[in-house]
Amino acid sequence: MHHHHPPYHLRRKSHNFLFTNLKMAAAAAASSAATVTASPTTASPACVSAATAGLPSAATSSTPVLSPTAAITAATAYCPSMLPTRKRPRRTYFTGDSSTGLGCSPAAHYLLYELPDEVLLTIFSYLYERDLCHVAQVCKRFYTIANDNELWKNLYQGLYEYDLPLFNPSPCKFDFVQPEECDYDNPWKESFKQLYHGVHVRENYHKHGGKETGRSVAYFETIQAAFDYCDDMERPLVLIHSGVYRTRLIIETNISLIGAAPGNVAENVILEEERESTVLFNEGAQQAYLGYVTIKFSPHSCNDTVQHHKHYALEIQENCAPTIEHCIIRSVSHLGAAVSVSGPGADPGIRHCEISDCENVGLIITDRAQGHYEDNEISRNALAGIWVKNYANPIMRRNHIHHGKDVGIFCFDGGQGYFEANDIHNNRIAGFEVKAQANPTVVRCEIHNGQTGGIYVHEHGMGQFIENKIHSNKYAGVWITSNSNPTIRRNEIYNGLQGGVYIFGDGRGLIEHNNIYGNALAGIQIRTNSDPIVRHNKIHDGQHGGIYVHEKGQGLIECNEVYANTLAGVWITTGSTPTLRRNRIHSGKQVGVYFYDNGHGLLEDNDIFNHLYSGVQIRTGSNPIIRRNKIWGGQNGGVLVYNGGLGLLEQNEIFDNAMAGVWIKTDSNPILRRNKIYDGREAGICIFNGVKGCWRRMKFSEMHKQVF
């Protein structure tokens, strides 16, 4: 592990001696004539009063902060040739009595003008922050050197240990920023100032139980001691340094706790508990903050987990709204969850956290709790990644939920929520499961590579699934069953290893404006008394049929475009009775609409064209109503009724087919009424032996004045 090693031992040994002498020389210089010393009005804005923070504010000075030794890593590496060219003032100076203010002593003049920058920088490196602020007021040269970036970087890393400047621009907001991306001339100094009011917790820090000599920094060995010290503070900040802290934290105030360590901060600062919830936020923690730590709940053994079904690594109760960021959260309990958010008024912000490798559910949100959950990694948990139940209503954005051993997100028992732009994949069951009156809104998520399916809505589940990408799932992209009634709108549902949308077991639902393509089975499958509304979808390029309605399936199917599928555009079979209106069904590699084995239903006002087989086929007891359709461009005829097919065909336009407009054969008995059959390359109607049927008021073109 990388650590920063500032010369604390040198500072403690030589601080008073160095600074006393430096102040004496500076005092002599400050009393010199105006021709020698800097103007007080130029240097004084560089410092903040010691009564406030003891630190300078670079933003209040218009003088640019230079870094004269940026290329020199230590004073021992000094070489005269490495120095920048610096114009020195004339060596003449007044020799009057310095006590009168009319002259400058040779020693003061040498200190101010002749002593090399590297030597001053080395001297300044032994000073603490408050003393640096003082010497920065002496003159412009001291101000420039005392604000050297490397000087403040070493000072900063010696106290806070971070590899990058950490900024606290507003309550509950802490961000690391690359120095070159900062707007500050000296980002290390600015970060130092923003964090300076913090209280430090460092294990085994025996020599610094209170304030450290020479600086206004408080150290404690336990988090509880730091809490006690901060009791009367407004918005206190506690910095927890590297170590394993086996303690329970109960937070009821607006305190900020943040890990402080080099490298990956959260991995080096660990909060762990074995008996009760490790971190508990209660009422009163409206603007509390916890960041950059690992939070673990580790019961002694598996036998103890029964008593821990309500214990968690992180627990947030009602009427509090803490912010938790950049934390690693683990639980090895086989019951409960790693994170629990429960109760009215529970409204946390959980961002950039990792909730992974837990032996239970990753995150439970329940009992009308809310909250914002953004940019988290939730993975490899033994049960669901997230549970939302009992009318909880969270907002979840840009989370990565993957490789769980159960479902990715499970909404049930009236759970709600808004889920946007989440990446949900490779979970053992569905990516998103909804049941029991749950009603989430899922927008612009990517739900893919599920080991069972993409979205599973069952047992009176609801929900709005809008503009998602649902693809590459092992089973159907969307499952709807058992009186569930979700809205599936403007999604891309593609490349499933089975079907696109599967509605069965009395499923309902509104399926509209989706792009469904490239699935191994039917783009939409409706069966067993299911009755959805399917409209304005594109269903194309499937390896099976476009829409498959069977086993007494129903549904209103309208205004869809179904094309370029490997098998029939629409299959209707086994007692099914859907209604198809105003669809465009075309360019299929087999039949356009295929009724067989007692398939029924209404086919009305559709365009059915350019199929390799017939536009419509009716067989084996099927008895549909086919009305006002345009059926044209078939490579094997317009309508084929055979093997005991029935049906009513009326007011259709059947034209430009390669073979007969209507074929009737093998014991079939359809009714044809007021159809227009024209421009075919064979007969208008072809009737074979054993055929019955009724047709009247038919209109044929000049080519079809005969019925064969």
Model-identified regions with their sequence ranges:
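CRL adaptor-proximal regions
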Residues: 1-125, 134, 144-212
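Acidic Gly/Asp/Thr-rich repetitive segments characteristic of extracellular carbohydrate-active
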Residues: 203-240
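Right-handed parallel beta-helix/beta-spiral solenoid domain characteristic of secreted/periplasmic
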Residues: 207, 215-220, 255-309
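Short, T/G/N/S-enriched strand-turn elements that build extracellular solenoid repeat scaffolds
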Residues: 223-231, 245-252, 279-282
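Short glycine/acidic-rich loop motifs that flank beta-strands on beta-rich extracellular proteins
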Residues: 248-250, 275-278, 299-305, 312, ...
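All-beta strand scaffolds that present successive hydrophobic residues in beta-strands
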Residues: 257-258, 288-290, 322-326, 348-351, ...
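Right-handed parallel beta-helix
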Residues: 294-391, 395, 400-402
